[in-house]
Amino acid sequence: YQVTQDTTPICTEGFVRIKDAQGKDKRINLTRIHMEEDSGKSIHDIDPFNTLVDLNRAGIPLLEIVSEPEIKNGEEAYSYLSEIRKLVRYLEISDGNMEEGSLRADLNISVRKKGTTKFGTKVEVKNMNSFRNVQKAIDFEIIRQIDLIEGGTPIFQETRTFDAVKNCTIGLRTKEDAHDYRYFPEPDLVPVIVSASYVDEVR
């Protein structure tokens, strides 16, 4: 199992500024930033038939940054991750090396018709460990979903992985709804309320 802050994140809102395809400033708003316990690293690009699990980082705390659904394509995602890496390196909280597992990305991708506001069914591509593969996975998944919809095939909520050899996503499992994750309080970690006066005292 994985320990997560879930409903009590470190912070909410905020934004990351990127350059869009036209070189213009674009603001990607953040939903929240919260702490989690790293439970392991899935490796999909070594064995074409099996997913390997690296447990060297199990138990190490990680910081999850959740963005609003405002990234339009793979190029913007690449720019967004580049800015995140600059930030964590500047703050000296991580080396930001994706290939070593210090920075990873889970992608939630959906498409919708132009002019509509309702999002389509999202598909998650997990544990991406390369900026370039993130870009390729998003652009592939956008085309795949559009082709399915135009062909009259519904999109199912599922978890997929990216095949770096074939440059395509592959289905892993159907996605559970949030209430099926079986969240429950961790009895060894009691809630800690940090007051403003305590923060001032520590400073």
Predicted region positions:
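Basic, nucleic-acid-interacting segments
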Residues: Y1-R203
